[in-house]
């Protein structure tokens, strides 16, 4: 549904400028890559000589799980994760669940009214600071039996799911 942008609480500071290492798993041309590249372009323009955001895409710094560990260690400063967040804390599972968000207008409302408080609480629990939410498309469940439009439509359907306990529970 949406992807959470995570930042470590501390940045690596060199003698003259701040270096921000920003990792993600997206391949060139993906929404992950386009989003992070655009962020880096805007940030670098504003930072000028004060620092630089360097992007490491295509899992150059590891998969999501390793990226999140590197945030904790301080060897990477920002990470754009995917479904791995639900394994860090249950509340992040909201991003894995289909049928919760009806459309973009609904998501905008949730983003403004619900997520800020949720993320503030999660920072204290997890040590990760969520600084933005970016779209990564809406979740759809597909199969070769019938359309899935409501959770009830899943009855009797066997599916393979990514490693997300909330998707498995559904």
Regions found by a protein language model. Give the residues of each.
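Bacterial N-terminal signal peptides
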Residues: 2-12
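Immediate post-signal peptide segment of exported/extracytoplasmic ligand-binding proteins
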Residues: 15-24, 37, 41-52, 124, ...
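Contiguous mixed-secondary-structure segments that line small-molecule binding/active-site clefts
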Residues: 40-41, 72, 77, 82-170
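Extracytoplasmic "Venus flytrap"
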Residues: 21-38, 58-63
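Glycine-/proline-rich flexible loop or hinge segments
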Residues: 23-25, 50-55, 93, 100-104
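Extracytoplasmic small-molecule ligand-binding "clamshell" domains
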Residues: 38, 45-46, 52-78, 103
């Amino acid at each position: 549904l949406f992807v959470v942008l995570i930042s470590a609480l501390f940045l690596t500071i060199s003698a003259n400028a701040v270096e921000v290492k920003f990792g993600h798993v997206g391949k060139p041309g993906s929404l992950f890559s386009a989003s992070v590249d655009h962020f880096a372009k805007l940030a670098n323009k504003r930072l000028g000589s004060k620092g630089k955001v360097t992007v490491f895409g295509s899992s150059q710094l590891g998969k999501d799980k390793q990226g999140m560990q590197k945030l904790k260690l301080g060897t990477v400063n920002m990470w754009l994760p995917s479904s791995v967040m639900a394994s860090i804390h249950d509340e992040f599972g909201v991003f894995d669940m289909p049928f919760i968000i009806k459309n973009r207008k609904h998501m905008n409302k949730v983003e403004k009214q619900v997520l800020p408080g949720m993320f503030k609480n999660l920072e204290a629990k997890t040590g990760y600071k969520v600084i933005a939410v970016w779209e990564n498309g809406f979740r759809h469940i597909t199969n070769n039996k019938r359309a899935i439009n409501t959770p009830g439509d899943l009855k009797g359907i066997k599916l393979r799911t990514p490693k997300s306990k909330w998707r498995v529970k559904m």
